[in-house]
Amino acid sequence: MLKMDTANNYDLESTNVLDITTMEMVSDSGKYIKRINVPATDQMPALCFELTGRKEKDDYNENLSRFFHYPDKLLITTDGIIIQQLDFDENDFSPCALDDFGFEYGDFRFDGYGGFKILCSSMGKNPVWKFWVWDENKKSFVNYPDLEMAGYINFDYNNQEINVSSSGGGDLHEFLTYKYDNDKLILIEKVIDADQDGKRKVFKLIDGELQLTETTESQLK
């Protein structure tokens, strides 16, 4: 059973990995280990994520000293007790320039329970993430494909909204805003800038349907 710390004031919001990691190299085939420690909250214990990755030199550009990284496994512990291990298949991931794979921990369903994400692909214009969220019944993290959409994802904890921005090439950009309704993600706003006619168009959820509510000059010209 997980031990919960109910006497702390830490708010579970997205936590960037760069402030809380340690790293060590292991001799096996260019593998390395990054450890990410996150504090306890009222609903989650303090956790240590031990991420094992493999790096290989980028042989396509001899002029750059650059490495690509692939995730191997993720070991999750609390108070030194293993609660879960995830084994990754390299074929499910594109080469990543980041050795931490953009790891981020946060309350991605705004329910007080933790979750984490890592990059699945960062090679194109829009990153793609894999998400896991805490399942209180299973006492483990489970894959959460509802959030696995292409684009840059930002969690607005004040408004409990999820904002996704993506580029379609050229001046075309799309900005999506989601909210949860009974644990289901609902698209409540869609902004296209610029559309084929060079306009910025705003669509909002009205009576269960996205409807065009505003058309202005593009802000990206």
Describe the role of every protein-language-model region.
Residues 73-97, 140-151, 162-163, 189:
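Blade-edge motifs of beta-propeller repeat domains
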